[in-house]
UniProtKB/Swiss-Prot annotation:
Main location: nucleus
Top-level division of the source organism's lineage: Eukaryota
Species assigned in the record: Homo sapiens
A single GO molecular function term of this UniProt record: RNA polymerase II cis-regulatory region sequence-specific DNA binding
Annotated signal sequence range: none
CCHHC-type zinc finger locations on the chain: 359-402, 403-446, 715-758, 759-802, 807-850, 860-903
Binding site for Zn(2+) 2: 412, 417, 430, 436
Protein name: Suppression of tumorigenicity 18 protein
Tissues and organs where the protein is expressed, per its UniProt entry: Detected at low levels in heart, liver, kidney, skeletal muscle, pancreas, testis, ovary and prostate. Detected at even lower levels in mammary epithelial cells and breast cancer cells.
Compositionally skewed regions (Polar residues) per UniProt: 550-563
């Protein structure tokens, strides 16, 4: 068999409508058990190692091309329809079972000499199974089997080895049929196979198997698609005049009555029937055709119906492939990278919380990931506790590849833990169960509810009863197979999945010091979510919740929850108890709460008055809405498919985690504008009525869990719950670590965030009243809480002491309230700062004189009626304490800035007036000064004209000087050239007259050169004289010597 046979699934080449295949699958699986599967199961049981047959949902081979297979399927059907139309004879199916492996093919070729009587028995059984197809059409049950998470937290399915060992194909080969004794039972391909090797059939059918709950050697044949995708059937070819030889059909009535005993020899034998000649086969086939004609017609009709169903599935596969091709490629790469980086704890790790005596899971490699680091120099001091890059001294040398590789490894191994609420509040350094609040919660649950595990009154999970019926149904459908007892299977599953509810209210009371709330069974609320919106981001969600109990559904499939739901809901409930302590999970109360939102709760979170003052008061009267119904409109009755988990304090199902991740991410800012349900204080103030109403509200058919009623004292009911006054704060992250003792904004991490958000909304009202002050440098450090001049550095520097003016003194609001008092004689001595009757001598005098008839004094009446702020025009709003009766100074008044500005303007006007009155006294002096100014201006003009003339003369002289300087330069250059020529001539003359000596003179030289020249000039100038012949000869010789000199 070539490589293409491994990638193709079963097909049929007839026409018709779809028919259920459950009965056919069951009979064929009983008839043809896989010897190879038996051999592998025996080996695995001998070794004692569980076989990991799960494969990722997204792993598929590189040759994944459903379009080509779909086209090939259509072409095969077109070619096969031709002989059916041309031949008028009724055709019978020739069956040959093709193994999926080359080893099985070789076994089939060796066993090609099987006996004819056994072949006829097989043919008889095949026809009988096809006849009963119509009877089981209404009995096909669509069941869903949930899967546990694989190593990376994504749903795992069956591996392709099951498909290769348990699938068979049927075809014809020129009238000769070959039967293999090791034919595997027919099974449907799961979702993993439709993504990997059976992708050309378009994700047609799926079967999710649970390794823990599957009985040994009992194959399950279920459909998980709500669209009723049909299973693929053996491929059958029909030919014109050739029919199947069915010898000894009438002689095998005992085998017809007991097909299982009849199949014992074919399954265990090693020989294959040898066939007679072609002529004998044709004659016997004609005989069988006349007897079994009607049965074959029914079988052919049923197979034609199956062919149409498979054709529809092939077309659907093409559409699914085009839609999810890119998504599968991306998720495949992400999954491969994640599996290389981390090893997530699976169901084996979860048993640690179920059974305290279970062995600890295998530790991960506790080596520092940085190359060349042996653990020395770390912050922890020991590298077995150092499994990340943080705290390593060699962190600077880490290449980018290692940083990217260990980016997602640093997760908390606790299922459902996102790193929040740890002891060190950093999940990057939290890689173990120590310090994890969810792990502590589950350990506390085991110790508290140990007695409830053994109690027979514990309510059974609906899925356990469902599994019991499922095991019984499998036992009824396969009577000849040896399976384990239903009680043993259910008890084993109860160990793995049946967890006892955990009281998180008592956990809050012990760990966080919180007074426990009412322990009642809350009403169920499952928010409806469309099936198409289940986990829209399957890449981001597993990183957020590494091992959460939510199922990642394949696209286009309906979501359902089955066997592992109780275990998953337990982890989700534990995660919800911790996540409720986070400031970013306030929507969880909306999901879990079964009371609708009241009108007053919308504005109860943040109250800001018209001047922008934040009311952080603890003593507020909250009106309870007693007529609020207990359940909302979307309350759903629990079903085995949804399987919500009910605890004694809260109710959490998988939809809660879905809503928590879809509504708001961890990194998004808190939205205080959302409306919330009733707070814990409102729930606590009316506990008795809620207890009675919740007991009366019961759902039909619901398994009730007894919850004891706590005895609540009257003073505990009336006592107000002391919570943090910051809106949106649940007490986590305070400096004290316990919000029960935290009754103010100091030490709250959300106080600054809340005030900044309010400041952004009410920036004008919350500004510092000092002009030019932006709030920086205050004593409090935050101008959002600084609305007065106290603590402002600019107010101290630029502030001016107020001196009351006459108008302010005459203002009646600034006077003493006692009638007739002008402020004199007060204790303070200044009536401007005395605005009450205390310290007034007239007040004391009149109080003595007034008869004690119960009537109050006039100033007391005025004070009660008009207790205004002493600043004019201020009604007391906007002060720091928001109570102007206790406000007896200007500090904290927002209108004080206007008074300061007014004081500054009055001082400027005063200085101007002083300059005006103390300066010039008369107009004459002003006129005299004006005349002097005019004279000075005229003299200035004259001087300026003279200056202009002088400037022109200076410029002309400067130009002349420049020209003279240039001429001097030229003369100097000429002189230098002449001196050079003179020097040259003197040297030439000295050299030429060196031999001639004048009388009475020595030989010519530089020292006597001038004298020598003077004598020569005198001699030549007096040529008219009569010289002696000697002198004449001397002159001639001198002339001859001088001829060589050129001037």
């Amino acid at each position: 068999m070539d490589a293409e046979a491994e990638d193709k699934t079963l097909r049929t080449r007839s026409k018709g409508t779809e028919v259920p295949m459950d009965s056919l699958i069951q009979e064929l699986s009983v008839a043809y058990d896989c010897s190879m599967a038996k051999k592998r199961t025996a080996e695995d049981q001998a070794l004692g190692v569980p076989v990991n047959k799960r494969k990722s949902l997204l792993m598929k081979p590189r040759h994944y091309s459903p379009k080509a297979d779909c086209q090939e399927d259509r072409s095969d059907r077109t070619e096969d329809d031709g002989p059916l139309e041309t031949h008028g004879h009724s055709t019978a199916e020739e069956i040959m079972i093709k193994p999926m492996d080359e080893s099985l093919l070789s076994t089939a070729q060796e066993n090609s000499s099987r006996k004819e009587d056994r072949y006829s028995c097989y043919q008889e059984l095949m026809v009988k199974s096809l006849m009963h197809l119509g009877k089981f059409e209404k009995n096909v049950s669509v069941q869903t089997v949930s899967e546990n998470l694989n190593d990376s937290g994504i749903q795992s399915l069956k591996a392709e080895s099951d498909e290769a060992d348990e699938c068979f194909l049927i075809h014809s080969d020129d009238g000769r049929d070959k039967i293999d004794d090791s034919q595997p039972p027919f099974c449907s391909s799961d979702d993993n196979e439709s993504n990997s090797e059976s992708a050309e059939n378009g994700w047609d059918s799926g079967s999710n198997f649970s390794e823990e709950t599957k009985p040994p050697r009992v194959p399950k044949y279920v459909l998980t698609d709500h669209k009723k995708d049909l299973l693929e059937v053996p491929e059958i070819k029909t030919e014109g005049d050739k029919f199947i030889p069915c010898e000894n059909r009438c002689d095998s009535e005992t085998e017809r009555k007991d097909p299982q005993n009849a199949l014992a020899e074919p399954l265990d034998g090693n020989a294959q029937p040898s066939f007679p000649d072609v002529e004998e086969e044709d004659s016997e086939s004609l005989a069988v055709m006349t007897e079994e004609g009607s049965d074959l017609e029914k079988a052919k009709g049923n197979l034609s119906l199956l062919e149409q169903a498979i054709a529809l599935q092939a077309e659907r596969g093409c559409v699914f492939h085009n839609t999810y091709k890119e998504l599968d490629r991306f998720l495949l790469e992400h999954l491969a990278g994640e599996r290389r980086q981390t090893k997530v704890i699976d169901m084996g790790g979860r048993q640690i919380f179920n059974n305290k005596h279970s062995p600890r899971p295998e530790k991960r490699e506790t080596k520092c990931p940085i190359p060349g680091c042996d653990g020395t120099g770390h912050v922890t001091g020991l590298y077995p506790h150092h499994r990340s890059l943080s705290g390593c001294p060699h962190k600077v040398r880490v290449p980018l590849e290692i940083l990217a590789m260990h980016e997602n490894v640093l997760k908390c191994p606790t299922p459902g833990c996102t790193g929040r609420g740890h002891v060190n509040s950093n999940r990057n350094t939290h890689r173990s169960l120590s310090g994890c609040p969810i792990a502590a919660a589950e350990k506390l649950a085991m110790s508290q509810d140990k007695n409830q595990l053994d109690s027979p009154q514990t309510g059974q999970c609906p899925d356990q009863a469902h599994r019991t019926s499922l095991v019984k149904q499998i036992e009824f459908n396969f009577p000849s197979q040896a399976i384990t007892s239903p009680r043993a299977t259910v008890s084993k599953e109860q160990e793995k999945f049946g967890k006892v509810p955990f009281d998180y209210a008592s956990f809050d009371a012990q760990v966080f010091g919180k007074r426990p709330l009412i322990q009642t069974v809350q009403g169920r609320k499952t928010p409806p979510f469309p099936e198409s919106k289940h986990f829209p981001n399957p890449v981001k969600f597993p990183n957020r919740l590494p091992s959460a109990g939510a199922h990642t559904q394949s696209p286009g499939r309906a979501s359902s929850y089955s066997y592992g739901q109780c275990s998953e809901d337990t982890h989700i409930a534990a995660a919800a108890a911790i996540l409720n302590l986070s400031t970013r999970c306030r929507e969880a109360t909306d999901i879990l709460s079964n009371k609708p939102q009241s009108l007053h709760a919308k504005g109860a979170e943040i109250e800001v008055d018209e001047n922008g003052t934040l009311d952080l008061s603890m003593k507020k009267n909250r009106i309870l809405d007693k007529s609020a119904p207990l359940t909302s409109s979307n309350t759903s009755i629990p079903t085995p498919s949804s399987s919500p988990f009910k605890t004694s304090s809260i109710l959490v199902n998988a939809a809660f985690y879905q809503a928590l991740c879809d509504q708001e991410g961890w990194d998004t800012p808190i939205n205080y504008s959302k409306t919330h349900g009733k707070t814990e204080e409102e729930k606590e103030k009316d506990p008795v009525s809620s207890l009675e109403n919740l007991e009366e509200k019961k759902f039909p058919g619901e398994a009730s869990i007894p919850s004891p009623k706590p005895k609540l004292h009257a003073r505990d009911l009336k006592k107000e719950l002391i919570t943090c006054p910051t809106p949106g704060c649940d007490g986590s992250g305070h400096v004290t670590g316990n919000y029960a003792s935290h009754r103010s904004v100091s030490g709250c991490p959300l106080a600054d965030k809340t005030l900044k958000s309010l400041m952004a909304a009410n920036s004008q009202e919350l500004k510092c009243p000092t002009p030019g002050c932006d709030g920086s440098g205050h004593v409090t450090g935050n101008y959002a809480s600084h609305r007065s001049l106290s603590g402002c550095p600019r107010a101290r520097k630029g502030g001016v002491k107020m001196t009351p003016t006459k108008e302010e003194k005459e203002d009646p609001e600034l006077k003493c309230p006692v009638i007739g008092c002008d402020g004199q004689g007060h204790i303070s001595g200044k009536y401007t700062s005395h605005r009450t009757a205390s310290g007034c001598p007239l007040a004391a005098k009149r109080q003595k004189e007034n008869p004690l008839n119960g009537a109050s004094l006039s100033w007391k009446l005025n004070k009660q009626e008009l207790p205004h702020c002493p600043l004019p025009g201020c009604n007391g709003l906007g002060h720091v304490n928001n109570v102007f009766v206790t406000h007896r100074s200007l500090s904290g008044c927002p209108l004080n800035a206007q008074v300061i500005k007014k004081g500054k303007v009055s001082e400027e006007l005063m200085t101007i007036k002083l300059k005006a009155t103390g300066g010039i006294e008369s107009d004459e002096e002003i006129r005299h000064l004006d005349e002097e100014i005019k004279e000075l201006n005229e003299s200035n003009l004259k001087i300026e004209a003279d200056m202009m003339k002088l400037q022109t003369q200076i410029t002309s002289m400067e130009s002349n000087l420049k020209t003279i300087e240039e001429e001097n330069k030229l003369i100097e250059q000429n002189n230098e050239s002449l001196l050079k020529e003179l020097a040259g001539l003197s040297q030439a003359l000295i050299s030429s007259l060196a031999d001639i000596q004048l009388p009475q003179m020595g030989p010519i030289s530089e020292q006597n050169f001038e004298a020598y020249v003077n004598t020569l000039t005198d001699m030549y100038s007096n040529l008219e004289r009569d010289y002696s012949p000697e002198c004449k000869a001397l002159l001639e010789s001198i002339k001859q010597a001088v001829k060589g000199i050129h001037v």
